[in-house]
């Protein structure tokens, strides 16, 4: 019975940490894109912003999953390493976004929240997923 309780505690801790990292991912995308992300997606139904946010969430989820899956036997060390890898993944995705913005014409953030579909959205989403895949491979 204590194994179940112990497992529930660990699952709750990792789950809460994962949720915090996902929320930080939402905040990060909201900071990088002009305007209010929630309003753009839920009220204005902006597909471009939704694709960028979705790719960031999938990326963060993949990083957290890989970090938990390959975690240390020591619970505390595993929890800290998951937090650190998750935060590093967020930083790396932000840096990749800023580099992409630097090397492409115009302001990438403004382009990504246009109402009309734009190919830059798919490039940005792919960049998020690629950075996350590299992070996952590095963790594993």
Question: Over which residues does each language-model region extend?
Answer:
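Juxtamembrane boundary at the C-terminal end of a transmembrane helix
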Residues: 133-140
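Membrane-interface helix-loop junction between the first two transmembrane segments
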Residues: 24-43
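Alpha-helical transmembrane segments
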Residues: 3-21, 77-92
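Alpha-helical transmembrane segments of multipass membrane proteins
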Residues: 18-26, 89-97, 128-132
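Membrane-interface helix termini and inter-helical loops of multi-pass transporters
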Residues: 1-5, 38, 68-79, 110
């Amino acid at each position: 019975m204590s194994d179940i309780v112990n497992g529930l505690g660990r699952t709750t801790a990792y789950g809460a940490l994962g949720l915090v990292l996902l929320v930080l991912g939402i905040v990060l995308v909201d900071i990088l894109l002009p305007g209010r992300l929630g309003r753009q997606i839920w009220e204005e139904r902006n597909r471009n912003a939704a694709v960028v946010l979705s790719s960031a969430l999938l990326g963060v989820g993949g990083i957290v999953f890989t970090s938990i899956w390959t975690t240390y036997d020591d619970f505390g060390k595993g929890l800290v390493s998951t937090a650190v890898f998750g935060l590093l993944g967020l930083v790396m995705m932000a840096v990749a976004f800023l580099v992409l913005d630097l090397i492409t014409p115009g302001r990438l953030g403004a382009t990504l929240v246009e109402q009309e579909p734009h190919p830059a959205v798919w490039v940005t989403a792919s960049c998020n997923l690629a950075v996350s895949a590299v992070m996952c491979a590095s963790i594993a």
